[in-house]
Design a protein with these regions (language model features):
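Bacterial N-terminal signal peptides
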Residues: 6-17
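Short beta-strand segments of immunoglobulin-like
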Residues: 36-38, 164-169
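Proline-centered linker/hinge motifs at extracellular inter-domain junctions
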Residues: 128-165, 187
Protein backbone atom coordinates (compact mmCIF):
# COMPACT_ATOMS: atom_id res chain seq x y z
CA UNK A 1 0.00 0.00 0.00
CA UNK A 2 1.48 3.43 -0.51
CA UNK A 3 2.46 2.91 2.85
CA UNK A 4 4.65 0.75 0.66
CA UNK A 5 5.68 3.62 0.43
CA UNK A 6 6.30 4.93 -2.89
CA UNK A 7 3.90 3.37 -5.31
CA UNK A 8 5.93 2.03 -8.21
CA UNK A 9 4.73 3.19 -11.58
CA UNK A 10 5.49 1.34 -14.79
CA UNK A 11 4.27 1.77 -18.33
CA UNK A 12 3.51 -0.58 -21.20
CA UNK A 13 3.10 0.87 -24.69
CA UNK A 14 0.41 -0.79 -26.80
CA UNK A 15 -0.31 -0.15 -30.48
CA UNK A 16 -3.86 -1.18 -31.37
CA UNK A 17 -5.00 -1.77 -34.94
CA UNK A 18 -8.57 -1.89 -36.18
CA UNK A 19 -10.37 -5.12 -37.17
CA UNK A 20 -13.60 -6.17 -39.48
CA UNK A 21 -25.35 13.39 -8.43
CA UNK A 22 -25.74 14.14 -5.16
CA UNK A 23 -26.49 17.80 -4.11
CA UNK A 24 -22.90 18.68 -3.25
CA UNK A 25 -21.01 16.28 -5.50
CA UNK A 26 -20.40 16.30 -9.24
CA UNK A 27 -20.42 13.46 -11.73
CA UNK A 28 -19.51 15.38 -14.91
CA UNK A 29 -18.54 18.80 -16.19
CA UNK A 30 -16.10 19.91 -13.51
CA UNK A 31 -12.44 20.91 -13.84
CA UNK A 32 -9.19 19.23 -12.75
CA UNK A 33 -6.70 20.75 -10.33
CA UNK A 34 -3.09 19.77 -11.14
CA UNK A 35 -1.16 19.25 -7.90
CA UNK A 36 2.50 19.67 -7.05
CA UNK A 37 3.16 17.07 -4.34
CA UNK A 38 6.80 17.86 -3.57
CA UNK A 39 10.37 17.05 -4.58
CA UNK A 40 13.20 14.74 -3.62
CA UNK A 41 16.90 14.62 -4.47
CA UNK A 42 18.35 11.89 -6.68
CA UNK A 43 21.69 10.14 -6.23
CA UNK A 44 23.11 11.70 -9.42
CA UNK A 45 22.50 15.25 -8.18
CA UNK A 46 19.29 15.84 -10.11
CA UNK A 47 15.89 16.39 -8.51
CA UNK A 48 12.48 14.79 -9.03
CA UNK A 49 9.35 16.94 -8.96
CA UNK A 50 6.29 14.85 -8.05
CA UNK A 51 2.82 15.64 -9.38
CA UNK A 52 -0.72 14.40 -8.97
CA UNK A 53 -4.16 15.89 -9.53
CA UNK A 54 -7.68 16.34 -8.19
CA UNK A 55 -10.38 15.53 -10.72
CA UNK A 56 -13.45 17.27 -9.30
CA UNK A 57 -15.70 14.73 -11.05
CA UNK A 58 -16.80 11.43 -9.53
CA UNK A 59 -17.58 9.81 -12.89
CA UNK A 60 -16.10 11.77 -15.80
CA UNK A 61 -12.58 10.71 -16.80
CA UNK A 62 -11.43 13.41 -19.23
CA UNK A 63 -8.88 12.77 -21.97
CA UNK A 64 -6.74 15.86 -22.52
CA UNK A 65 -4.08 15.63 -25.24
CA UNK A 66 -0.66 17.19 -24.83
CA UNK A 67 -0.95 20.70 -26.23
CA UNK A 68 -2.64 23.96 -25.35
CA UNK A 69 -4.79 22.31 -22.66
CA UNK A 70 -2.17 20.05 -21.05
CA UNK A 71 1.43 21.25 -21.01
CA UNK A 72 4.50 22.09 -18.98
CA UNK A 73 6.53 25.28 -19.15
CA UNK A 74 9.22 26.35 -19.55
CA UNK A 75 10.79 23.81 -21.88
CA UNK A 76 9.17 20.66 -23.22
CA UNK A 77 5.39 20.66 -23.06
CA UNK A 78 5.38 16.88 -22.69
CA UNK A 79 7.01 15.78 -19.42
CA UNK A 80 5.35 12.39 -19.16
CA UNK A 81 2.11 13.65 -17.63
CA UNK A 82 -1.12 11.68 -18.08
CA UNK A 83 -3.60 12.54 -20.80
CA UNK A 84 -6.30 10.35 -19.21
CA UNK A 85 -7.50 11.46 -15.79
CA UNK A 86 -9.11 9.12 -13.28
CA UNK A 87 -11.77 10.46 -10.90
CA UNK A 88 -11.08 12.38 -7.70
CA UNK A 89 -7.74 12.68 -5.88
CA UNK A 90 -4.72 10.95 -7.39
CA UNK A 91 -1.50 11.63 -5.48
CA UNK A 92 2.13 11.19 -6.55
CA UNK A 93 1.11 10.01 -10.02
CA UNK A 94 4.28 10.88 -11.95
CA UNK A 95 7.68 12.53 -11.59
CA UNK A 96 9.62 15.04 -13.67
CA UNK A 97 13.42 15.04 -13.32
CA UNK A 98 15.13 18.43 -13.43
CA UNK A 99 18.90 19.12 -13.56
CA UNK A 100 21.15 19.72 -10.57
CA UNK A 101 21.45 23.44 -11.41
CA UNK A 102 17.67 24.03 -11.34
CA UNK A 103 18.03 26.58 -8.57
CA UNK A 104 15.04 28.81 -7.78
CA UNK A 105 13.19 28.37 -11.07
CA UNK A 106 9.57 27.18 -11.31
CA UNK A 107 8.21 24.37 -13.47
CA UNK A 108 4.53 24.92 -14.25
CA UNK A 109 1.95 22.29 -15.24
CA UNK A 110 -1.13 23.80 -16.92
CA UNK A 111 -4.43 21.95 -17.38
CA UNK A 112 -7.58 23.28 -19.03
CA UNK A 113 -10.54 20.93 -18.55
CA UNK A 114 -14.18 21.76 -19.21
CA UNK A 115 -13.23 25.36 -19.90
CA UNK A 116 -11.42 26.03 -16.62
CA UNK A 117 -7.65 26.50 -16.53
CA UNK A 118 -5.57 25.58 -13.50
CA UNK A 119 -1.81 25.52 -12.85
CA UNK A 120 0.56 23.76 -10.46
CA UNK A 121 3.89 25.41 -9.63
CA UNK A 122 6.87 23.20 -8.75
CA UNK A 123 9.92 24.58 -6.94
CA UNK A 124 12.78 23.32 -4.79
CA UNK A 125 11.62 25.21 -1.71
CA UNK A 126 12.53 23.38 1.49
CA UNK A 127 8.91 23.08 2.60
CA UNK A 128 8.19 20.80 -0.36
CA UNK A 129 10.95 18.26 0.37
CA UNK A 130 9.38 14.81 0.85
CA UNK A 131 10.55 11.32 1.74
CA UNK A 132 8.85 7.94 1.95
CA UNK A 133 7.26 8.70 5.31
CA UNK A 134 5.75 11.93 4.00
CA UNK A 135 4.33 10.06 1.02
CA UNK A 136 2.88 7.38 3.31
CA UNK A 137 1.31 10.03 5.50
CA UNK A 138 -0.10 12.09 2.62
CA UNK A 139 -1.71 9.05 0.99
CA UNK A 140 -3.38 7.93 4.20
CA UNK A 141 -1.29 4.90 5.10
CA UNK A 142 -0.38 6.29 8.52
CA UNK A 143 -3.85 7.42 9.49
CA UNK A 144 -3.84 10.56 11.63
CA UNK A 145 -0.11 11.23 11.39
CA UNK A 146 1.20 8.33 13.45
CA UNK A 147 4.09 6.02 12.59
CA UNK A 148 5.72 2.87 13.92
CA UNK A 149 9.00 0.95 13.52
CA UNK A 150 7.14 -1.23 11.01
CA UNK A 151 6.01 1.68 8.85
CA UNK A 152 9.44 3.31 8.98
CA UNK A 153 11.08 0.05 7.84
CA UNK A 154 8.72 -0.33 4.90
CA UNK A 155 10.18 -0.12 1.39
CA UNK A 156 8.36 0.12 -1.98
CA UNK A 157 7.45 -2.98 -3.98
CA UNK A 158 9.68 -3.98 -6.88
CA UNK A 159 7.67 -4.35 -10.09
CA UNK A 160 8.81 -5.97 -13.32
CA UNK A 161 6.92 -6.52 -16.56
CA UNK A 162 7.55 -9.98 -17.97
CA UNK A 163 8.37 -9.79 -21.68
CA UNK A 164 8.30 -6.84 -24.04
CA UNK A 165 7.32 -3.34 -22.95
CA UNK A 166 5.79 -2.69 -26.38
CA UNK A 167 2.93 -4.92 -27.53
CA UNK A 168 0.61 -5.02 -30.53
CA UNK A 169 -3.07 -5.90 -30.26
CA UNK A 170 -6.24 -5.79 -32.32
CA UNK A 171 -9.41 -3.94 -31.41
CA UNK A 172 -11.73 -6.14 -29.36
CA UNK A 173 -9.18 -8.91 -28.84
CA UNK A 174 -7.63 -9.55 -25.44
CA UNK A 175 -3.91 -9.33 -24.87
CA UNK A 176 -2.39 -10.71 -21.69
CA UNK A 177 0.69 -9.68 -19.77
CA UNK A 178 2.31 -10.77 -16.54
CA UNK A 179 3.64 -8.45 -13.85
CA UNK A 180 5.99 -9.61 -11.11
CA UNK A 181 5.57 -7.82 -7.77
CA UNK A 182 8.09 -8.39 -4.97
CA UNK A 183 7.17 -6.86 -1.64
CA UNK A 184 8.47 -6.84 1.93
CA UNK A 185 5.04 -7.55 3.42
CA UNK A 186 5.00 -4.31 5.40
CA UNK A 187 2.80 -2.94 6.74
CA UNK A 188 0.84 -6.10 7.44
CA UNK A 189 -2.55 -6.32 5.75
CA UNK A 190 -5.74 -6.32 7.77
CA UNK A 191 -7.10 -9.81 8.32
CA UNK A 192 -10.48 -10.77 6.92
CA UNK A 193 -13.30 -9.88 9.25
CA UNK A 194 -15.75 -12.29 10.86
CA UNK A 195 -18.30 -9.49 11.20
CA UNK A 196 -21.91 -10.62 10.88
CA UNK A 197 -23.85 -9.79 7.74
CA UNK A 198 -26.22 -7.45 9.59
CA UNK A 199 -23.34 -5.53 11.18
CA UNK A 200 -21.60 -5.31 7.82
CA UNK A 201 -24.72 -3.82 6.26
CA UNK A 202 -24.94 -1.24 9.03
CA UNK A 203 -21.31 -0.27 8.49
CA UNK A 204 -21.92 0.10 4.76
CA UNK A 205 -24.74 2.56 5.43
CA UNK A 206 -22.83 4.57 8.03
CA UNK A 207 -21.36 7.88 6.77
CA UNK A 208 -17.52 8.01 6.76
CA UNK A 209 -16.06 9.41 10.00
CA UNK A 210 -12.37 9.78 9.14
CA UNK A 211 -10.77 13.01 10.30
CA UNK A 212 -8.04 12.79 7.66
CA UNK A 213 -7.27 10.77 4.54
CA UNK A 214 -7.05 7.11 5.50
CA UNK A 215 -6.53 3.90 3.59
CA UNK A 216 -6.52 0.17 4.18
CA UNK A 217 -2.96 -1.15 4.05
CA UNK A 218 -2.41 -4.19 1.87
CA UNK A 219 -0.56 -5.07 -1.32
CA UNK A 220 -2.40 -4.62 -4.60
CA UNK A 221 -1.60 -4.12 -8.28
CA UNK A 222 -3.73 -1.84 -10.43
CA UNK A 223 -3.49 -1.32 -14.19
CA UNK A 224 -5.20 1.66 -15.82
CA UNK A 225 -5.10 3.67 -19.02
CA UNK A 226 -2.59 6.54 -18.84
CA UNK A 227 -2.73 7.71 -22.44
CA UNK A 228 -4.67 6.60 -25.48
CA UNK A 229 -7.70 7.36 -27.67
CA UNK A 230 -10.22 4.74 -26.53
CA UNK A 231 -11.39 2.72 -23.56
CA UNK A 232 -9.40 -0.15 -22.05
CA UNK A 233 -11.06 -2.98 -20.13
CA UNK A 234 -8.95 -5.02 -17.72
CA UNK A 235 -9.64 -8.52 -16.44
CA UNK A 236 -9.71 -9.26 -13.59
CA UNK A 237 -11.20 -5.90 -12.52
CA UNK A 238 -8.55 -3.73 -10.91
CA UNK A 239 -8.63 -2.08 -7.47
CA UNK A 240 -8.98 1.66 -7.91
CA UNK A 241 -5.72 3.60 -7.44
CA UNK A 242 -7.70 6.77 -6.70
CA UNK A 243 -9.30 7.85 -3.45
CA UNK A 244 -12.80 6.44 -3.77
CA UNK A 245 -13.92 6.87 -0.16
CA UNK A 246 -17.36 5.35 -0.60
CA UNK A 247 -17.79 2.53 1.89
CA UNK A 248 -18.26 -0.30 -0.61
CA UNK A 249 -15.72 0.93 -3.17
CA UNK A 250 -13.09 -1.40 -4.62
CA UNK A 251 -10.48 1.05 -3.39
CA UNK A 252 -7.99 1.04 -0.49
CA UNK A 253 -9.67 4.27 0.64
CA UNK A 254 -13.04 2.53 1.02
CA UNK A 255 -13.77 1.72 4.66
CA UNK A 256 -14.66 -1.95 4.10
CA UNK A 257 -12.08 -2.73 1.41
CA UNK A 258 -9.95 -5.85 1.84
CA UNK A 259 -6.71 -6.43 -0.12
CA UNK A 260 -6.97 -9.07 -2.85
CA UNK A 261 -5.20 -12.37 -2.40
CA UNK A 262 -1.61 -12.04 -3.65
CA UNK A 263 -0.29 -14.86 -5.87
CA UNK A 264 2.30 -16.99 -4.08
CA UNK A 265 4.85 -16.55 -6.88
CA UNK A 266 4.23 -12.79 -7.10
CA UNK A 267 3.12 -13.05 -10.74
CA UNK A 268 -0.06 -11.20 -11.65
CA UNK A 269 -1.65 -12.07 -15.01
CA UNK A 270 -3.93 -9.43 -16.51
CA UNK A 271 -5.73 -9.13 -19.83
CA UNK A 272 -6.53 -5.85 -21.55
CA UNK A 273 -9.04 -5.21 -24.33
CA UNK A 274 -9.08 -2.02 -26.45
CA UNK A 275 -12.16 -0.60 -28.15
CA UNK A 276 -10.40 1.79 -30.56
CA UNK A 277 -7.20 1.74 -32.64
CA UNK A 278 -4.23 3.86 -31.64
CA UNK A 279 -1.19 3.98 -29.39
CA UNK A 280 -1.75 3.54 -25.67
CA UNK A 281 0.30 3.82 -22.51
CA UNK A 282 -0.90 1.65 -19.64
CA UNK A 283 -0.06 2.65 -16.09
CA UNK A 284 0.69 0.00 -13.48
CA UNK A 285 0.77 0.81 -9.78
CA UNK A 286 1.93 -1.65 -7.13
CA UNK A 287 1.08 -0.30 -3.72
Amino acid sequence: SISRVNALLIAVFVVVTSSAALADTYQFGQHIEPAYEGWRPNADGTFSFMFGYMNENWTEQPDVAIGDNNFFSPGDADRGQPTHFLPRRNRFTFEVVVPSDWGERELVWTLNVNGIERKAYATLKDDYLVDNMVIASETGSLGAGTSSPESRANIPPVVTIQGDDIRTARVGEEISFVTQVIDDGLPKARRESTTSESDLQRRMMRPPTRITVGKVNGLFLSWNKYRGPGNVTFDPPMPKPWEDTRTSANSPWGALWLPPEAPEDGLYEVTATFDAPGTYILWGRAD
